[in-house]
Amino acid sequence: MRTADLFYALYARRLRRQTAAGPLPKHIGLIMDGNRRWARQMGMANPSIGHRYGAEHVESVLSWCETAGIKHVTVFVCSTENLQRRGDTEVSFLMQVIEQVVAVHLARPDARWQVRIAGTLDXPCADSTAHALKEAVEATRRCTTGSQVTLAIGYGGRQEVIDAVRELLHEQAAAGTTLEDLAASLTMDDITRHLYTAGQPDPDLVIRTSGEQRMSNFLLWQSAYSELYFCEAYWPAFREIDFLRALRSYAARQRRYGA
C-alpha cells in the first residue's frame, strides 16, 4: 500500500470513529453538482462524459450512506431547468446514462435500496427513461432491508409545491369542501402529504458538491430546517472522507429548527 493510501485509510478510520458517536442524519439530500467541470478538469474532450462518471459514482456514495446507517437518501439527478436549458444532444446522452445506471445498479433482483422517484417523468424524460425508472421502482418495492433512495429527476421544488396544492384542491373539491372552508382549515401537513416525497422524513442534512452554495430549487419545502454542507470537490471526485467530514460537521451542530 502506498504511503498516501495508508494515510487516507487511517484518516477515514478516524473519521468513522468520530461520526459513530453521532448524532447522525436520518435523511440526507445530495445535490451532485460539477460533473461537466470535473470532465473539463480531467481533460476530456466532451464535458458531458462527466455525467456518466457522476452517475456511476452514485452507487459508491449510497454504500457509504448505508454503512453509516442513513435510512433515507434523496439524490438530485436533474432539474426541470436542466432538461429545458441543455442542448438536445446533452439531454439525450444524460437520459441514456440514467437508463443504464438505473438498470445495472438499482433495478436488480438483489437490490439493496428501495427506489422512489420525485419529479415529473412523462413530460421532460424520454419514454424509455421513464419506463426504466418506473421498472426500478417496481423491482425494488419489496426491498425493506436497506436505505430508501429517492431519485429527483425532472424535479423542481417550486413546481412540487404547485402540484401539491393543485392535488389538494382537487381532493377537497371531490369531497365537497368549499374554498372558504379549505382556506380556514389549511395546514402545513395538508401540503406535505401531497408532495412528491409524501411519507418520507424531511432531510436533516443537504450536501452539495462543486463549491456552489445554493439550493437550486431542491426540496424547498422539505429543507426549511435542514443543515447545509457545501463541499469544494466536484461530484465524481467526492470521496468517502468528504462524506464523513459532512457527517462530522452535522454531528457538531446544534439544530434549532428556526428557533
Curated annotation (Swiss-Prot):
<dbReference type="InterPro" id="IPR018520">
    <property type="entry name" value="UPP_synth-like_CS"/>
</dbReference>
<dbReference type="GO" id="GO:0005886">
    <property type="term" value="C:plasma membrane"/>
</dbReference>
<keyword id="KW-0808">Transferase</keyword>
<feature type="binding site">
    <location>
        <position position="38"/>
    </location>
    <ligand>
        <name>substrate</name>
    </ligand>
</feature>
<feature type="binding site">
    <location>
        <begin position="79"/>
        <end position="81"/>
    </location>
    <ligand>
        <name>substrate</name>
    </ligand>
</feature>
<feature type="binding site">
    <location>
        <position position="86"/>
    </location>
    <ligand>
        <name>substrate</name>
    </ligand>
</feature>
<comment type="function">
    <text>Catalyzes the condensation of isopentenyl diphosphate (IPP) with allylic pyrophosphates generating different type of terpenoids.</text>
</comment>
<comment type="similarity">
    <text>Belongs to the UPP synthase family.</text>
</comment>
<protein>
    <recommendedName>
        <fullName>Isoprenyl transferase</fullName>
        <ecNumber>2.5.1.-</ecNumber>
    </recommendedName>
</protein>
<feature type="binding site">
    <location>
        <position position="227"/>
    </location>
    <ligand>
        <name>Mg(2+)</name>
    </ligand>
</feature>
<feature type="active site">
    <location>
        <position position="33"/>
    </location>
</feature>
<dbReference type="GO" id="GO:0045547">
    <property type="term" value="F:ditrans,polycis-polyprenyl diphosphate synthase [(2E,6E)-farnesyl diphosphate specific] activity"/>
</dbReference>
<feature type="binding site">
    <location>
        <position position="208"/>
    </location>
    <ligand>
        <name>substrate</name>
    </ligand>
</feature>
<feature type="binding site">
    <location>
        <begin position="214"/>
        <end position="216"/>
    </location>
    <ligand>
        <name>substrate</name>
    </ligand>
</feature>
<dbReference type="GO" id="GO:0000287">
    <property type="term" value="F:magnesium ion binding"/>
</dbReference>
<dbReference type="InterPro" id="IPR001441">
    <property type="entry name" value="UPP_synth-like"/>
</dbReference>
<dbReference type="Pfam" id="PF01255">
    <property type="entry name" value="Prenyltransf"/>
</dbReference>
<dbReference type="GO" id="GO:0033850">
    <property type="term" value="F:Z-farnesyl diphosphate synthase activity"/>
</dbReference>
<keyword id="KW-0460">Magnesium</keyword>
<feature type="binding site">
    <location>
        <position position="33"/>
    </location>
    <ligand>
        <name>Mg(2+)</name>
    </ligand>
</feature>
<feature type="active site" description="Proton acceptor">
    <location>
        <position position="82"/>
    </location>
</feature>
<dbReference type="GO" id="GO:0016094">
    <property type="term" value="P:polyprenol biosynthetic process"/>
</dbReference>
<dbReference type="InterPro" id="IPR036424">
    <property type="entry name" value="UPP_synth-like_sf"/>
</dbReference>
<feature type="binding site">
    <location>
        <position position="51"/>
    </location>
    <ligand>
        <name>substrate</name>
    </ligand>
</feature>
<feature type="binding site">
    <location>
        <begin position="34"/>
        <end position="37"/>
    </location>
    <ligand>
        <name>substrate</name>
    </ligand>
</feature>
<comment type="subunit">
    <text>Homodimer.</text>
</comment>
<keyword id="KW-0479">Metal-binding</keyword>
